[in-house]
Amino acid sequence: MTDLAEPLPGVAAAPRTSAPRGYALYLVAASLFALNGTVAKTVMANGVDVWRLSQLRATGAFVVLLAFVALVNRRALRVRRGEIPLLAVYGVLGVAATQALYFLSITRLAIGVSLLIEFTSPLVIALWFRFGLRHPTKPAVWVGLAMASAGLAIVAEVWDGFTLDPLGFAAALGAMLALVLYFLSADAQVRGPYRRDPISLTMWGMGAAALFWAVADPWWSYPWSTLGGTALVEGTGAVAWPIPLLVGYVVVLGTVVPFSFAVLSMRHLRASQASVVGMTEPIIATGIAWVLLGETFSPVQLAGAVLVLGGILLAERNR
């Protein structure tokens, strides 16, 4: 899952003291998120269930963030009764559903394709603001929407009878819609009467997701034996990677660290600048999956991917 499909809600950019530093931080975050897809796909290909990996990611990230917030901002540990419903929506539909559906999609689609579909979430948000909230929309947003739609059709090779796996495509669409709820509920939280900083908001979102998974898949039934093996990654030679090490990457370097870097970068960048750097994630993810997993795009699909990213970028910069 990515958290960079659009600039993080509630993170107001401070005066830009160092734009290069901001770009570097956001690029590192995008790269870590990009590698996370390949690592997660490898873990799932070696016996760890999609839902259980989602449970491990949410629970592990919650524990790490809880320890951090307890050290630096103990007041943020307090949850007021009025914010519980919104935090529940944010955590269950925004966090848990986005992660699980993205993981499901990459078990059946190329990682780059899944991310391209998920990255169209800002366009759906723009449609919601236009038709749901009746906000005016610039013509460039409609051009961007048309470009992204055409690009997705090219990536799916619809003229050849739609070559993408139907379940994988449906899961990616579901992840995209869940990501829309993630951004809208987060935005409502940080602008409403119970405002939170982005770190504690993410912590409680992960906490709500972890609680959801604990009820849906109780820990006492966890198949711990699936974490005891090793996994071979095609592009790393004959190295056998311990599954717990790869899961640790998904939790720490694939979730907590890149999110923190993204938050720090927003102290130096405007949202429009950050959105440009965020567009590198599917590009980097596709390159990593090509090298490590052998996933490839045809030249026509690459052209479609460029059209999708161009459309998203055009719409983002004209919202």
For the regions a language model picked out, list residue spans one by one:
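C-terminal-most transmembrane helix of multi-pass membrane proteins
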Residues: 2-13, 58, 157, 243-245, ...
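Hydrophobic transmembrane alpha-helices of multi-pass small-molecule transport proteins
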Residues: 2-5, 65, 69, 128, ...
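Glycine-/small-residue-enriched transmembrane alpha-helix faces in small-molecule transporters
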Residues: 2-56, 161-191, 209-215
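Juxtamembrane helix-entry segments on the extracytoplasmic side of multipass membrane proteins
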Residues: 18-22, 47-55, 79-85, 157-178, ...
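Specific transmembrane alpha-helical segments of multi-pass solute transporters/efflux pumps
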Residues: 32-37, 66-114, 118, 154, ...
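Hydrophobic/aromatic residues within transmembrane alpha-helices
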Residues: 43, 53, 57, 105, ...
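Helix-helix packing/entry segments at the starts of transmembrane helices
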Residues: 56, 99, 113-120, 186-210, ...
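Membrane-interface helix-cap regions at the ends of transmembrane helices
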Residues: 61-80, 94, 147-163, 207-243, ...
